[in-house]
């Protein structure tokens, strides 16, 4: 049985893709063993992220660490997948000639053949083409062990924000046919999955073809998934404010399975910066979406993405972002210092903000966001939360870990039969990034 080591960088889409790589290899070899140490593996895969320079360079650092393993065992297969593979292509082989296969997000289904071709020819294989939806037609049915699962409904992005490399590494937006998505979810539900997380670079741009040739939009998809037997909770990530329509907002009113947690990236509170980023909305338009959502779902927890130190961002513009964060009361969010990506329009902009100032802005924004997260956690003490038990706690092997609808981790004392089940927990303690609870007896 082939032993496979895989390291995943970046977003949930990459996590989904990594699972699919393991699945296609398992189908090819009649099963595989996933190992946690690279020196135990027959196949080593790095599923990469190119959103920030630091993540990209980390890949080449890791490749350097496994080079001695290749020298010791020439039959070892080393592969680079994901967005760095799409962006760098043949350059990866030039920089690290011991790499055997390089493939993009849209060609992961070709991995087994690429390995065979490498072993047959002795030549490194590179396939970073964009065959659109083809990959989904060649992936084996999903097999899961947990109570929650990702389902990719679309790939790519056509927004071309000035700072973002995704359209160049994952291609333009394309949606999976509706029936394909529903079949995958129904299959997962039959395996005991309780929670579905719909995935895409911009899920609210979903336009899936139906059997009759008509198009299903994202709001309609949510309503259909809501009725699939066995599915008790629904999430989605990531969405774009430009296409967060009233019909999607109304789903928060009508669909109780849709969780009270939303990740909706804004990036900046400055209209000038948003325009330079080519985001396609103003801060006021974003706030209008949130007002509508909270009017019909008052308990909604909102997380977001922010970039500080975008080229030309002034202190006043950063203060506008800080004010917006306080006004909206964002939950735990992701704040990044701007990282220029090759080939994007923003990479050509003049950047005169000192790094030390960017770090100060990062810390100031994180301080406000973490304070709000802690406040929300405190308000949950004494409440009873419906939670999905994910497994053994990462903090204490004698405890279990569950997740609330608003995306909080709860550690508690329970029994193994609770894993992958929905249970009620009373929250007893709150920390900055997690909660403690106890089982509510029926």
Swiss-Prot record:
[4Fe-4S] cluster 2 binds at residues 157, 161, 164. Binds 2 [4Fe-4S] clusters. One cluster is coordinated with 3 cysteines and an exchangeable S-adenosyl-L-methionine. GO terms for molecular function: 4 iron, 4 sulfur cluster binding; metal ion binding; N6-isopentenyladenosine methylthiotransferase activity. It is found in: Cytoplasm. Its cofactor is [4Fe-4S] cluster. Its EC number is 2.8.4.3. Residues 2-120 form the MTTase N-terminal domain. Signal peptide: none annotated. It is an enzyme of class 2 (transferase). GO terms for cellular component: cytosol. PROSITE patterns: MTTASE_N, MTTASE_RADICAL, RADICAL_SAM, TRAM. InterPro entries: Elp3/MiaA/NifB-like_rSAM, Methylthiotransferase, Methylthiotransferase_CS, Methylthiotransferase_N, Methylthiotransferase_N_sf, MiaB_methiolase, rSAM, rSAM_horseshoe. Residues 143-375 form the Radical SAM core domain. The keyword Magnesium does not apply. Catalyzes the methylthiolation of N6-(dimethylallyl)adenosine (i(6)A), leading to the formation of 2-methylthio-N6-(dimethylallyl)adenosine (ms(2)i(6)A) at position 37 in tRNAs that read codons beginning with uridine. This is tRNA-2-methylthio-N(6)-dimethylallyladenosine synthase. It comes from Neisseria meningitidis serogroup C / serotype 2a (strain ATCC 700532 / DSM 15464 / FAM18).
């Amino acid at each position: 049985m082939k032993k496979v080591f895989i390291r995943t960088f970046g977003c949930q889409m990459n996590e989904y893709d990594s699972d699919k790589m393991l699945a296609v290899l398992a189908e090819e070899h009649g099963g595989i063993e996933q190992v946690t140490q690279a020196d135990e593996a027959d196949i080593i895969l790095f599923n990469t992220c190119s959103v920030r320079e630091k993540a990209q360079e980390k890949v080449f650092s890791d490749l350097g660490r496994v080079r001695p393993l290749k020298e010791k065992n020439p039959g070892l297969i080393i592969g680079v997948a994901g967005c760095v593979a799409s962006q760098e292509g043949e350059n990866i082989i030039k920089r690290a000639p011991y790499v055997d296969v390089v493939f993009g997000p849209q060609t992961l289904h070709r991995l087994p053949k690429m390995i065979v071709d490498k072993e047959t020819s002795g030549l490194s294989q590179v396939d970073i083409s964009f065959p659109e939806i083809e990959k989904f037609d060649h992936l084996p049915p999903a097999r899961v062990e947990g109570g929650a699962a990702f389902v990719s409904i679309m790939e790519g992005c056509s927004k071309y924000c000035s700072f973002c490399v995704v359209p160049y590494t994952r291609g333009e937006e394309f949606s999976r046919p509706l029936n394909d998505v529903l079949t995958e979810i129904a299959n997962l539900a039959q395996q005991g999955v309780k929670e579905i997380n719909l995935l895409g670079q911009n899920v609210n741009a979903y336009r899936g073809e139906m059997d009759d040739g008509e198009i299903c939009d994202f709001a309609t998809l949510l309503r259909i998934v809501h009725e699939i037997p066995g599915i008790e909770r629904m999430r989605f990530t990531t969405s774009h404010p430009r296409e967060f329509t009233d019909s999607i907002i109304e789903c928060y009113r009508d669909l109780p399975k849709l969780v009270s947690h939303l990740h909706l990236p804004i990036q900046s509170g400055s209209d000038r910066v948003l325009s330079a980023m080519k985001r396609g909305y103003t801060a006021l338009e974003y706030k209008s979406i949130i007002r509508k959502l909270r009017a019909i779902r008052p308990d909604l927890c909102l997380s977001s993405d922010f970039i500080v130190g975008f080229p030309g961002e002034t202190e006043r513009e950063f203060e506008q972002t800080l004010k917006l964060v306080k006004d909206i009361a964002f939950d735990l969010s992701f704040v990044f210092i701007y990282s220029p990506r090759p080939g994007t329009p923003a990479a050509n902009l003049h950047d005169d903000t000192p790094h030390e100032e960017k770090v100060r802005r990062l810390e100031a924004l994180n301080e406000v966001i973490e304070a709000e997260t802690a406040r929300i956690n405190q308000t949950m003490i004494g409440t009873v939360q419906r939670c999905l038990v994910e497994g053994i706690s990462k903090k204490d092997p004698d405890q279990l870990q569950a997740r609330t609808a608003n995306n909080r981790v709860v550690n508690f004392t329970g029994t193994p039969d609770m894993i992958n089940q929905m249970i009620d927990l009373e929250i007893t303690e709150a920390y900055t990034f997690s909660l403690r609870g106890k089982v509510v007896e029926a």
